[in-house]
C-alpha cells in the first residue's frame, strides 16, 4: 500500500516512477506493471483487513495528500476523486470506515492527528511559522476518538509528513504511547542517506505476535 502525500503526484504510474527514479527505466516499468496487476495500490479512505497472530485487524487508510493544519488540502482534487468537499465530509467518511472496522484498528495516514501538542518540537506541531500551533489533522483526531467511543481499540496510528528534525534543529519524538495507542511519525528526512559503509534506507517495522505489537526503526543497507 502507498499512502500519497502532499508532494506526490495523483497518478499511480507517476508515483511509481517517483519512488524508483534512481533505479532506472526498467525498474520503473516493472513497478508500473505491478501496480496495474494490483501489487502496488494507492490507499486513502480505504479499509484493508489484516490477519496476524490469530487476530483480525482493520487497517484504515485515512485522508491522503494532507498538508496538515485547519484546511482541506487540494480541495478540487479531493472533491473530484473522493467526493470530499470539506473536513467535515472527511470526518463522516472516516466515521463510516470505523463503523465497518473490526475491534482492533490501525490508522495509516500521511499527516498525523491533531491533539498531540502545539509546540514546534511536538509530534505534529508546526515548526515553519511563528505561532503555528498544532498542525495535526482534525478529522483524523476525531475518527480516533469516535473509534474509542464505539469501544474499538486503536492499536496504532502511523503517519509522517512533519519532519522529525524541525527547522529549529530540535528532534521530534518518533514514537509515543498515549491511552494504549502507539503513535508513529516515520518522517525521517532524508529517508535514504549515505552512511560510513553503505547507502541506507530508513523504515519503521511493525511486528504483531501473540503477545502484542512492537515497533522499531530499521536502517536497511542498499548493498550490504
Language-model features: locations:
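Core catalytic region of metal-dependent phosphoesterases/phosphodiesterases
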Residues: 1-53, 172-176
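Active-site neighborhood of phospho(di)ester-bond hydrolases with catalytic His/Asp-centered motifs
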Residues: 1-6, 42-45, 106-110, 135, ...
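A structural motif corresponding to the C-terminal end of an alpha-helix
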Residues: 31-43, 51-52, 97-101, 142-156
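Binuclear metal-dependent phosphoesterase catalytic core
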Residues: 50-53, 146-153, 162-224
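Binuclear metal-dependent hydrolase catalytic cores centered on His/Asp/Glu-rich metal-binding motifs
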Residues: 52-104, 136
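Active-site-proximal beta-strand elements of phosphoester/diester hydrolases
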Residues: 56-71, 106-110, 181-189, 216-220
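Active-site-proximal segments of metal-dependent phosphoesterases and phosphodiesterases across multiple
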Residues: 103-153
Amino acid at each position: 500500500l502507498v499512502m500519497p502525500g502532499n508532494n506526490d503526484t495523483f497518478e499511480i504510474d507517476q508515483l511509481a516512477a517517483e519512488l524508483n527514479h534512481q533505479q532506472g527505466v526498467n525498474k520503473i516499468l516493472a513497478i508500473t506493471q505491478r501496480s496495474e496487476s494490483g501489487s502496488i495500490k494507492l490507499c486513502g479512505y480505504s479499509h484493508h483487513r489484516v490477519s496476524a497472530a490469530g487476530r483480525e485487524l482493520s487497517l484504515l487508510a485515512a485522508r491522503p495528500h494532507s498538508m496538515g493544519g485547519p484546511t482541506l488540502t487540494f480541495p478540487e482534487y479531493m472533491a473530484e476523486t473522493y467526493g470530499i468537499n470539506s473536513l467535515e465530509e472527511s470526518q463522516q467518511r472516516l466515521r463510516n470506515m470505523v463503523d465497518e472496522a473490526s475491534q482492533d484498528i490501525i490508522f495509516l495516514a500521511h499527516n498525523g492527528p491533531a491533539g498531540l501538542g502545539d509546540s514546534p518540537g511536538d509530534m505534529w506541531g508546526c515548526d515553519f511559522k511563528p505561532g503555528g500551533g498544532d498542525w495535526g489533522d482534525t478529522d483524523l483526531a476525531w475518527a480516533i476518538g469516535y473509534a474509542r467511543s464505539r469501544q474499538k481499540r486503536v492499536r496504532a496510528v502511523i503517519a509522517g509528513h512533519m519532519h522529525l528534525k524541525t527547522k529549529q534543529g530540535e528532534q521530534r519524538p518518533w514514537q509515543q504511547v498515549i491511552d494504549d495507542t502507539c503513535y508513529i511519525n516515520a518522517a525521517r528526512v532524508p529517508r535514504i542517506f549515505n552512511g560510513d559503509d553503505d547507502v541506507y534506507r530508513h523504515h519503521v517495522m511493525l511486528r504483531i505476535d501473540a503477545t502484542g505489537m512492537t515497533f522499531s526503526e530499521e536502517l536497511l543497507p542498499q548493498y550490504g
